[in-house]
Amino acid sequence: IDALSGIERKNRFFKQLNKIYNRVANSYDSINKQALQKLTNSDFIKAFDQVPYVIKGMENLPDEATNIFFYNHLASIEENGLANGHQFSIDSHFISAKILFPKYGDGGQRIARYSRNTEFWRYNYYENLDYIFVHTPESDYLNETQEQKKKRKSKLFIETQNIFDQNRPLVIAPEGTSETEDNLTPNSPGPLKPGA
């Protein structure tokens, strides 16, 4: 019976991931994106209640929500992948749902890499949650002038300042990529990217 209980919890976790993805991906443009973020955090709380975890140090979080929360981005787990190829960033959803949401009533504004043009399912999901997008080496190549690059960076700074003006936390993985063979979590934190 114990073995079945683990399988059942894993099944409930995966079903919850599917439910979350379908709700977010199929939401309409008219939906309030902050309300959708809160609903998604509540749904992820239910998902993470199916798996064992330990959180330490909540008492060390700042009282004010207007902070930048950095984390090391772990690689996706294949068995959590959806049929359409979407891979959840489970680590960032955990931080938002189980740490920031209970503390601040807000899972934070997340920054995500811009999806490649072949990842339409990913872009739609994060766009509906109103994430701030940044281009990384894992995004499609941008053929842009220095002036265009400067404008893109300026837009990012304006967007993030708007988040602080709303007294919301900002969540980012500044390493610029997920965990890989040459960038394993035991070797983290790696050096931050210049300007991070």
What are the residue ranges of the model-derived segments?
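Basic, amphipathic N-terminal segments that precede the first structured/catalytic domain
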Residues: 1-42, 103, 125, 141, ...
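Soluble catalytic domains of membrane acyltransferases
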Residues: 38-196
